[in-house]
Amino acid sequence: MAVITKIEVQKRSKERFNIYIDKGQGEEYGFSVNEVILIKHGLQKGLEIDEIALGNILYNEEVQKAYLQAISYLSYQMRTKLEIEDFLRKKEVGQAIISEVVSKLLHDRYINDKEYAILYTRTQSNVNRKGPTVIKRELLNKGVQDLIITHSLQEYPKEKQIENALILIEKKKKSYQKHSFLQMKLKLDEMLVRKGYSRDVIQICLEELKDEKDDEKQQEALHYHGNKYYEKYKKYDGWTLENKMKQALYRKGFSIDEIEIFLQMKREEG
């Protein structure tokens, strides 16, 4: 049995208190607690506490400490239940305390996976223009349940997906101006898959791209790659030269007819 002899406010934190006790051998430092725990357990000078009571006080102090760490972590941005649990584990908090902290955070509505999933879907679709497949994978990695994700993705209709995909295509296709139209389409297809768009949405967007095919730019790309390969293979003669040129340009996505026209031009130049 011990008796509280003095309660002192810490100099560095006005919300924490040092508790001094006497176990029968004079006053000594006992432990420190947060203001919440001080009030919760009614700690005051003259109060007698046994080992069981002390154990409860110290346990609740650890819970409160972990709770405040979680609140601080949440102050930067919303987090999922799993993210909070992982954060506390990295802080070497015990599982029993983690469970209590998460339960309190859920009760106080500091964490809510449903609200998080909806906000995350809106942000990733409107700001980063990610497709639903990537958004779903990221939410699953954050521990959000599949049913909640399905509900949140209703915020991202197909029309919006197509709009975003077309914006991405418009931005990216400028960097493929020296590629054949076919190769540009393949690269844009790969980009949209990486961004998380469905095959259906990608096909619709690339069909619209077909209507924008620029013959002049296609010819510029053909001449760019054709001349580059001609310089590379001009040490060969006749059939060997043309065969290597055809293979290289075909791999770049140019049609047989386009390649033949270019080779005919080179024959006339020669």
Curated annotation (Swiss-Prot):
One of its GO terms (cellular component) is cytoplasm. This is Regulatory protein RecX. HAMAP family: RecX (MF_01114). GO terms for biological process: regulation of DNA repair. The lineage of its organism: Bacteria, Bacillati, Bacillota, Bacilli, Bacillales. It comes from Bacillus cereus (strain 03BB102). PANTHER family: REGULATORY PROTEIN RECX FAMILY PROTEIN. Pfam families: RecX_HTH1 (PF21982), RecX_HTH2 (PF02631), RecX_HTH3 (PF21981). Modulates RecA activity. Keywords: Cytoplasm. It comes from the Bacteria. Belongs to the RecX family. It is found in: Cytoplasm. Its main location: cytoplasm. The keyword ATP-binding does not apply.
